[in-house]
Amino acid sequence: MASSSADNLTDKNIVFRKLKSKSENKVCFDCSAKNPTWASVTYGIFLCIDCSATHRNLGVHISFVRSTNLDSWSPEQLRTMMFGGNNRAQVFFKQHGWTDGGKIEAKYTSRAADLYRQILAKEVAKAIAEETNSGLLSSPVATSQLPEVSNGVSSYSVKEELPLSKHEATSATSSPKASNTVVPSTFKKPIGAKRTGKTGGLGARKLTTKPKDNLYEQKPEEVAPVIPAVSSTNNGESKSSAGSSFASRFEYNDDLQSGGQSVGGTQVLNHVAPPKSSSFFSDFGMDSSFPKKSSSNSSKSQVEESDEARKKFTNAKSISSAQYFGDQNKNADLESKATLQKFAGSASISSADFYGHDQDDSNIDITASDLINRLSFQAQQDLSSLVNIAGETKKKLGTLASGIFSDIQDRML
């Protein structure tokens, strides 16, 4: 019987069938339209679809609207509708000065609406708490599965342990968590339950059976020996490894001797080798490309001083370079004079003729100009051909369009 009544409270079809059987719930609370299919969970009232849209615009913090046919309802929401109803809400709002007419927004944002919402919420919470407590007290499962408590310790019967073999003992020690875990009871202590048994004491019980001796003969698990790395004391292995491969240039080795020799006598490079030469470019193989200067050339050459020029130009007011250096530029003057005499009877002289350059550049210039002319002529021909093609295409498209339009007109007529 209790289960059937609980199902009736959680089944929305049964709840709404009972609520809509009342005459005041057969019309909309705000506009009195017949057969409302929506409801405001916040106030427990029935609404039509138009008024439900207005409530939805107010926001869910003011009015939470749901469909009585399409939406799903929780038990708390159904209880709110059962505690509410159009008749109770109408009486409450009239007592606080609100009639059926008026603006919906002002009505549901007023102090009266807030007070009515709080009253419904308190009644629903109180009913749910009472049903929860009564369900725990009347539940046969909760009372039958609670263990008997004596002096704060549950009186679970201590079973006599069977003798274990060595194999079972080792398996039990390998999984102590599985054997020692106790599942706590999830049931709460019923209200008004009395403690049974004697009071006082810590609840310790004396063992009636003697523990088996084979439990103390269990051997602890042997830890697998860790395989050590290559020992530094093994001279034979270190010699073979040193002789088989050289150490890395950036590897740190503790067994290297101070002279750079390994144990096997093999030459091993140090961590950072000193440079073989002081030159920076010698490490990259670039030292050979630069000729080395002698020590005599590296120092500045000493200019031999003489008193010849000083004695020669003591009383001179000005000195020219030709007078100072003598006949060093006479050969150049003779060559230029000979070149000018070569073109004495010519009307014009080019730079190529004067300096003796080849005349192949003129042929190159002529070829380039000819190439430019040919390219421009070819471009003009291509442009004219493109213009002709565009004109022909335009004519073809025009004839095709006129044919299509004429065909469409013939079909329409």
UniProtKB/Swiss-Prot annotation:
Boundaries of every Arf-GAP domain copy: 13-131
Ranges of compositional bias, category Low complexity: 234-244, 289-301
Keywords: Acetylation, GTPase activation, Metal-binding, Phosphoprotein, Zinc, Zinc-finger
Bias type Basic and acidic residues, positions: 158-169, 210-222
Source organism superkingdom: Eukaryota
Zn finger spans (C4-type): 28-51
Chain positions with Phosphoserine modification: 318
CDD domains: ArfGap_ArfGap2_3_like
Gene3D superfamilies hit by this protein: Arf GTPase activating protein
Residue numbers of N-acetylalanine PTMs: 2
Annotated segments matching region Disordered: 158-244, 289-312
Keyword Zinc (UniProt): yes
InterPro entries: ARFGAP/RecO, ArfGAP_dom, ArfGAP_dom_sf
Biased composition (Polar residues): 170-184
Entry GO MF terms: GTPase activator activity; zinc ion binding
Its job: GTPase-activating protein (GAP) for ADP ribosylation factor (ARF).
Protein name: Probable ADP-ribosylation factor GTPase-activating protein AGD8
Record organism: Arabidopsis thaliana (Mouse-ear cress)
Gene that this sequence comes from: AGD8
